[in-house]
């Protein structure tokens, strides 16, 4: 019987296996390439009788078989022929590993389902002309006690046990752990041990013009300290640290004893380290490109460094890898020609191509089981099943509604419109449980997409996803019982639903969660999605030649729109039809790949043909916003995401730090644990300790707060910790210990003072007692400050510690600096918070830093103060206390009490009091003008609401700054039913008074304020797309204030997208006038805040 490809499915279900065995191949010739026998010599773990050399077995292995069958074949041969047959009788095939050598490294053939002919070792042997190649059969041994102890240490640091597989339905977690060994080892082997130990924080961006102006006569003065003496030297901004050391030693040749330098030592034995910080000035970078040097120039501070011995690179030793490497071919299937069933003896088929499966995909919904029924028993329930790829729903079906009881059974097959062969990698089977009142649901709509009418009357209760193509490229089959996620009610957790609903993890709380039982078609053999073979696209040249001018203009207009502009069906059709033209414009890529119909295998093949011809993309300059767009939730295809990651490889370390928060969040949008993005983050973290430090905390915070992605973040963090080195592991252990101890203290203090705002003397006394107990027993002698790894905190200054008067009872803690080279006795102030999710504050502060870097390119210094803030766990975190700063509220109250909110001159008088000379006062006013302009523009563009006099602060040098970013993008609070935000930003009469103006009058300072605002505003408009994309990515990731596209629209409106520069300038100047007109309303709000004690934010929370 011969099959006709277009008439019936080639891959038949289990009940038709007998029929398949009777099928004959169409032709023997067609099957030769994938049916060949491959000679392999297997080296066995047992020795020959007469000598100690190991036994070997030469086998001819079927190329189309899989690794599991090959291992069984070797084991059977060993049973038959080995002199130690008893050994093989005791141990089954699963007790052995298959290893081969490549370029001096041992690799494990790890994936038992991999087709033999796709193994990397075969390609290697062919390239090196080895026949037969050798594979070693090695006995698998249990992990050593030392190894288990190390794993326990890692589990404590991660906050999750990656070896616990009780909540997984496949081996993807273990597969990823093994897969990440290779990039980890490669990065550790290639990094410079000396540079890694000292992790210099540098940038290659040009020095801004405003900083050049602070360098007189092209000279920078550096004070070099050694023991109790110091020496000031004059250097050029272009001198490298090495040249500076050489110059210094030449100058001090005859005075070494003065600086406590042994005569035998030279500049080669020393490095420059910043006084009081673990920050080194080393390498071949000009001194002007070190971030600390720029920080000092910007703030008018002297540059103090200590002459120090370099740290020992041996302290960064990485524990010897216990696992053999796995090659990049692991988990990869063959080409369709190798896997297809056509033309083959079906008795010999072991793995079948997905593209042979011509029938429609279907799923059997057996039923659901719920531990606790809803209170309202008069409800009906149905299951909606979607197949989606990214945000694209490929098809949708649903069951009929049934009465909502503890167990609801359907036992019904839902057949989808998509064929099995068209299922793309990364496609999710999304199952959702809806309920509603009986009349609202009509059984007539069974198995169809719910109408908008019926959808409006029902409520989504539970959901779960299953990846239809697993991490091995194999189609899922058989029975699954999936524990579902419940939809959060009102509250902060609701904001994370957009991201959570993409997870393929199941609910670990099996006892208390809804479960759904489903059945997928079972097959005689694994069904594998083939690798795509790049082939020319015959349509390409014809389409390129046919583009009329009118359509070209239309295409260019589509490409020019911003990321929020929705694409119509006609737009998508045009982009796809002229895809080769679109390919020439990197800005078109997100729109082009949004136009792909991912549920059609032929279209996907053509998309990969496009990706193979992306020379313009590869050669274009890096546009971070554009590249990050390809990493958002709209793109699930790993090849599309990989070209974005490849582009990010050129980011320098400082920029990786700028975007690290978003990149970590973007990992949630990956369909699989192992991805190009996960590997990029791993490599950059292992290359630079500063990046590694923040990667650790960003991942650990997500593991603690996001159950939906715990496993994914945990497996990446484990891979990082296995390669970061002993010194970093020690640092992280100390930090985690400190946080766990302080968390316990905070919980104890909160239990004593309940929900009150005031703090009794008894509570303060208890705090000091608990801190003393910690200090005397468990607290580490020193630890790196999580939000600033250059700082090491030492002993607590207990007399300065207190409980802050607010609902969540944060601790105000002060630590002594642990570094003996610190020049002052200033403490390190940290607010330890429990009960608030600081991730949104982190987002805003990070965007402020990006705004600063945008302004720097236009030589604007807006004196922003993005203080340190980091989430270290589930609603736990640390905030930096800014020195010599106080809230506007405190200044207003300190003079005339609550009515200070209406006294325009109070702030100006306070600044005068803090300025010892007129010159210092004028400098403070200047700084106030710039910082006020910076925060006016930033808070307006970001829609930062809930601004009151307790969350606006000022330093004694006039630097205004905002804190507590709980309300963004226009999500403003109301008071007594009235929206409190009546002005675009805060520019009150007392602020204007500092600038020398009032009412509608003007002044030189106010004129400068307006000019700065306009320049800063227009500079941000040039980066509208970047700001939109950064926020769009966070839209899906658990920010309670970011839940819809409308939220992001706020930024678009604020930046006046579509207006010309002149109109935009007028628009912002109009906003300033609105503030001048309505400044009294803000003063009135501030008065209410002082009188009624409206606690919207923590006092002094920065």
Swiss-Prot record:
List GO terms (cellular component aspect). cytoplasm; cytosol; membrane; phosphatidylinositol 3-kinase complex, class IA; phosphatidylinositol 3-kinase complex, class IB; plasma membrane
Segments forming domain PI3K-ABD: 34-141
Instruction: Give every PIK helical domain span.
Output: 541-723
For region Activation loop, the annotated ranges are 962-988
* Residues that bind ATP: 829-838, 864-872, 961-969
Q: What class of enzyme is it?
A: transferase
Q: Which Gene3D superfamilies match?
A: 3.10.20.770, C2 domain, Phosphatidylinositol 3-/4-kinase, catalytic domain, Phosphatidylinositol 3-kinase Catalytic Subunit, Chain A, domain 4, Phosphatidylinositol 3-kinase, accessory domain (PIK)
Reaction catalysed by this enzyme: a 1,2-diacyl-sn-glycero-3-phospho-(1D-myo-inositol) + ATP = a 1,2-diacyl-sn-glycero-3-phospho-(1D-myo-inositol-3-phosphate) + ADP + H(+); a 1,2-diacyl-sn-glycero-3-phospho-(1D-myo-inositol-4,5-bisphosphate) + ATP = a 1,2-diacyl-sn-glycero-3-phospho-(1D-myo-inositol-3,4,5-trisphosphate) + ADP + H(+); a 1,2-diacyl-sn-glycero-3-phospho-(1D-myo-inositol 4-phosphate) + ATP = a 1,2-diacyl-sn-glycero-3-phospho-(1D-myo-inositol-3,4-bisphosphate) + ADP + H(+); L-seryl-[protein] + ATP = O-phospho-L-seryl-[protein] + ADP + H(+)
Q: Does the keyword Phosphoprotein apply?
A: yes
Q: Which GO terms describe its molecular function?
A: 1-phosphatidylinositol-3-kinase activity; 1-phosphatidylinositol-4,5-bisphosphate 3-kinase activity; 1-phosphatidylinositol-4-phosphate 3-kinase activity; ATP binding; ephrin receptor binding; identical protein binding; protein kinase activity; protein serine kinase activity
What PROSITE patterns does the annotation carry? C2_PI3K, PI3_4_KINASE_1, PI3_4_KINASE_2, PI3_4_KINASE_3, PI3K_ABD, PI3K_RBD, PIK_HELICAL
Q: In which pathway does it act?
A: Phospholipid metabolism; phosphatidylinositol phosphate biosynthesis
Residue span, C2 PI3K-type domain: 357-521
- Identify the residues that the record assigns to the PI3K-RBD domain, covering every copy: 217-309
Q: Which UniProt keywords apply?
A: Angiogenesis, ATP-binding, Cell membrane, Chemotaxis, Cytoplasm, Disease variant, Endocytosis, Immunity, Inflammatory response, Kinase, Lipid metabolism, Membrane, Nucleotide-binding, Phosphoprotein, Serine/threonine-protein kinase, Transferase
Region of interest called G-loop, as start-end residue ranges on this chain: 803-809
Cross-referenced Pfam families, in alphabetical order?
PI3_PI4_kinase, PI3K_C2, PI3K_rbd, PI3Ka, PIK3CG_ABD
Q: What is the recorded post-translational modification? A: Autophosphorylation at Ser-1101 has no effect on the phosphatidylinositol-4,5-bisphosphate 3-kinase activity.
Question: Which residues does the record list as Phosphothreonine (modified residue)?
Answer: 1024
Q: How is its activity regulated?
A: Activated by both the alpha and the beta-gamma G proteins following stimulation of G protein-coupled receptors (GPCRs). Activation by GPCRs is assisted by the regulatory subunits (PIK3R5 or PIK3R6) leading to the translocation from the cytosol to the plasma membrane and to kinase activation. Inhibited by AS-604850 and AS-605240.
| Residues recorded with modification Phosphoserine | 1101
Q: Anything else the record notes? A: Candidate target in therapy for inflammatory diseases. Selective inhibitors and protein ablation are anti-inflammatory in multiple disease models such as asthma, rheumatoid arthritis, allergy, systemic lupus erythematosus, airway inflammation, lung injury and pancreatitis.
Whom does it interact with, and what assembly results?
Heterodimer of a catalytic subunit PIK3CG and a PIK3R5 or PIK3R6 regulatory subunit. Interacts with GRK2 through the PIK helical domain. Interaction with GRK2 is required for targeting to agonist-occupied receptor. Interacts with PDE3B; regulates PDE3B activity and thereby cAMP levels in cells. Interacts with TPM2. Interacts with EPHA8; regulates integrin-mediated cell adhesion to substrate. Interacts with HRAS; the interaction is required for membrane recruitment and beta-gamma G protein dimer-dependent activation of the PI3K gamma complex PIK3CG:PIK3R6.
What protein family is recorded? Belongs to the PI3/PI4-kinase family.
Q: So what does this one do?
A: Phosphoinositide-3-kinase (PI3K) that phosphorylates PtdIns(4,5)P2 (Phosphatidylinositol 4,5-bisphosphate) to generate phosphatidylinositol 3,4,5-trisphosphate (PIP3). PIP3 plays a key role by recruiting PH domain-containing proteins to the membrane, including AKT1 and PDPK1, activating signaling cascades involved in cell growth, survival, proliferation, motility and morphology. Links G-protein coupled receptor activation to PIP3 production. Involved in immune, inflammatory and allergic responses. Modulates leukocyte chemotaxis to inflammatory sites and in response to chemoattractant agents.
Q: What is this protein called?
A: Phosphatidylinositol 4,5-bisphosphate 3-kinase catalytic subunit gamma isoform
Source organism: Homo sapiens (Human)
This protein's encoding gene: PIK3CG
């Amino acid at each position: 019987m011969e099959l006709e490809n277009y008439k019936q499915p080639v891959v038949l279900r289990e009940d038709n296996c007998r029929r398949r065995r009777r099928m004959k191949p169409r032709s023997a010739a067609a099957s030769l390439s994938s049916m060949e026998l491959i000679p392999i010599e297997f080296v066995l773990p047992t020795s020959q009788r007469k000598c100690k050399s190991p036994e070997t077995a030469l086998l001819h292995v079927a190329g189309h078989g899989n690794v599991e069958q090959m291992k069984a074949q070797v084991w059977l041969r060993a049973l038959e022929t080995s002199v130690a047959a008893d050994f093989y009788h005791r141990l089954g095939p699963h007790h052995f590993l298959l290893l081969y050598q490549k370029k001096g490294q041992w690799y494990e053939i790890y994936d038992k389902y991999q087709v033999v002919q796709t193994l990397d070792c075969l390609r290697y042997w062919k390239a090196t002309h080895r026949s037969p190649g050798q594979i070693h059969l090695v006995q698998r041994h249990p992990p050593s006690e030392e190894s288990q102890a190390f794993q326990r240490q890692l589990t404590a640091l991660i906050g999750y046990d990656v070896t616990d597989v009780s909540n997984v339905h496949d081996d993807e977690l273990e597969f990823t752990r093994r897969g990440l060994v290779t990039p980890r080892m490669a990065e550790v082997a290639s990094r410079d041990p000396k540079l890694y130990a000292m992790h210099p924080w540098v940038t290659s961006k040009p020095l801004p013009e405003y900083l050049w102006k602070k360098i007189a006569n092209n000279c920078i003065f550096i004070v070099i300290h050694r023991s109790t003496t110091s020496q000031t030297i004059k250097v050029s901004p272009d001198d490298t640290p090495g040249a500076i050391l050489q110059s210094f030693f030449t100058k001090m040749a005859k005075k070494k004893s003065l600086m406590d330098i042994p005569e035998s030592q030279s500049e080669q034995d020393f490095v420059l380290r910043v006084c009081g910080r673990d920050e080194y000035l080393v390498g071949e970078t000009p001194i002007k490109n070190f971030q600390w040097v720029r920080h000092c120039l910007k703030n008018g501070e002297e540059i103090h460094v200590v002459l120090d011995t370099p740290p020992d690179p041996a302290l960064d030793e990485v524990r010897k890898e216990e696992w053999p490497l796995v090659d990049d071919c692991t988990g990869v299937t063959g080409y369709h020609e190798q896997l297809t069933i056509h033309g083959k003896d079906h008795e010999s088929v072991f793995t079948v191509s997905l593209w042979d499966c011509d029938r429609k995909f279907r799923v059997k919904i057996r039923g659901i089981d719920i531990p606790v029924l809803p209170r309202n028993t008069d409800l009906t329930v149905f299951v909606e099943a979607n197949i989606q790829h990214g945000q694209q729903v490929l098809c949708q079906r649903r069951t009929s509604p049934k009465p909502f009881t503890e167990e609801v059974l359907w036992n019904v097959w839902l057949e989808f419109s998509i064929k099995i062969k068209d299922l793309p990698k990364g496609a999710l089977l999304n199952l959702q449980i809806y309920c509603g009142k009986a009349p609202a649901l009509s059984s007539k709509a069974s198995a169809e997409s719910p109408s908008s009418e019926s959808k409006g009357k029902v409520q989504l209760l539970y959901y779960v996803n299953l990846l239809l193509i697993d991490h091995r490229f194999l189609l899922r089959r058989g029975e699954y019982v999936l524990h579902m996620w419940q939809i959060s009610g009102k509250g902060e957790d609701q904001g994370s639903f957009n991201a959570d609903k993409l997870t393929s993890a199941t609910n670990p709380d099996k006892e208390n969660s809804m479960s759904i039982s489903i059945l997928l078609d079972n097959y005689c053999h694994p069904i594998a999605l083939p690798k795509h073979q790049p082939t020319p696209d015959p349509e390409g040249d014809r389409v390129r030649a046919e583009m009329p001018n009118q359509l070209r203009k239309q295409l260019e207009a589509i490409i020019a729109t911003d990321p929020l502009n929705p694409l119509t069906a006609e737009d998508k059709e045009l982009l796809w039809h002229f895809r080769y033209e679109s390919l020439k414009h990197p800005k078109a890529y997100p729109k082009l790949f949004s136009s792909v119909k991912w549920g059609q295998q032929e279209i996907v093949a053509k998309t990969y043909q496009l990706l193979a011809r992306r020379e313009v993309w590869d050669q274009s300059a890096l546009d971070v916003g554009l590249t990050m767009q390809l990493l958002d939730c709209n793109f699930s295809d790993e090849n599309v995401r990989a070209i974005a990651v490849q582009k990010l490889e050129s980011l320098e370390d400082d920029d990786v730090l700028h975007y690290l928060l978003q990149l970590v969040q973007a990992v949630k949008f990956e369909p699989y644990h192992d991805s190009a993005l996960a590997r990029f983050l791993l490599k950059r973290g292992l290359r630079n300790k500063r990046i590694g430090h923040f990667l650790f905390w960003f991942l650990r915070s997500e593991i603690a707060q996001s159950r939906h992605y715990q496993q994914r973040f945990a497996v990446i963090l484990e891979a990082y910790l296995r390669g970061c080195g002993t010194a970093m592991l020690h640092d992280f252990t100390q930090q985690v210990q400190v946080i766990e101890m302080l968390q316990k203290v905070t919980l104890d203090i909160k239990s004593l003072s309940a929900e009150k705002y005031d703090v009794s003397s008894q509570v303060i006394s208890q705090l000091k007692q608990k801190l003393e107990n910690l200090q005397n027993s468990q607290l580490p002698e020193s630890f790196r400050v999580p939000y600033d790894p250059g700082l090491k905190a030492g002993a607590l200054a207990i007399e300065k510690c207190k409980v802050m008067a607010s609902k969540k009872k944060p601790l105000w803690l002060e630590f002594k600096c642990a570094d003996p080279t610190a020049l002052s006795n200033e403490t390190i102030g940290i607010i330890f918070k429990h009960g608030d999710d600081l991730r949104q504050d982190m987002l805003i502060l990070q965007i402020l830093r990006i705004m600063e870097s945008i302004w720097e390119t236009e030589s604007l210094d807006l004196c922003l103060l993005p203080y340190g803030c980091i989430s270290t766990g589930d609603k736990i975190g640390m905030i930096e206390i800014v020195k010599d700063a106080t809230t506007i509220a405190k200044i207003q109250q300190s003079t005339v009490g609550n009515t200070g909110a209406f006294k325009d001159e109070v702030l100006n008088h306070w600044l005068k009091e803090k300025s010892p000379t007129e010159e210092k006062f004028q400098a403070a006013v200047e700084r106030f003008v710039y910082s006020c302009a910076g925060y006016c523009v930033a808070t307006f563009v970001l829609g930062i609401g809930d601004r009151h006099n307790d969350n606006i602060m000022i330093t004694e040098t006039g630097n205004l700054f905002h804190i507590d970013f709980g309300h963004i993008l226009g999500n403003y609070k109301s008071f007594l039913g009235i929206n409190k935000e009546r002005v675009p930003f805060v520019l009150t009469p007392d602020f204007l008074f500092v600038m020398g103006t009032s009412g509608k009058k003007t002044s030189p300072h106010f004129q400068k304020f307006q000019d700065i605002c306009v320049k800063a505003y227009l500079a941000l408009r040039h980066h509208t797309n970047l700001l939109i994309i950064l926020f769009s990515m966070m839209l899906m990731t658990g920010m309670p204030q970011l839940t819809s596209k409308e939220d992001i629209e706020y930024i678009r409106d604020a930046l006046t997208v579509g207006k010309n520069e002149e109109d935009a300038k007028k628009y912002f100047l109009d906003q300033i006038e609105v503030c001048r007109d309505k400044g009294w309303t803000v003063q009135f709000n501030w008065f209410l805040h002082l009188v009624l004690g409206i606690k919207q934010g923590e006092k002094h929370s920065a």
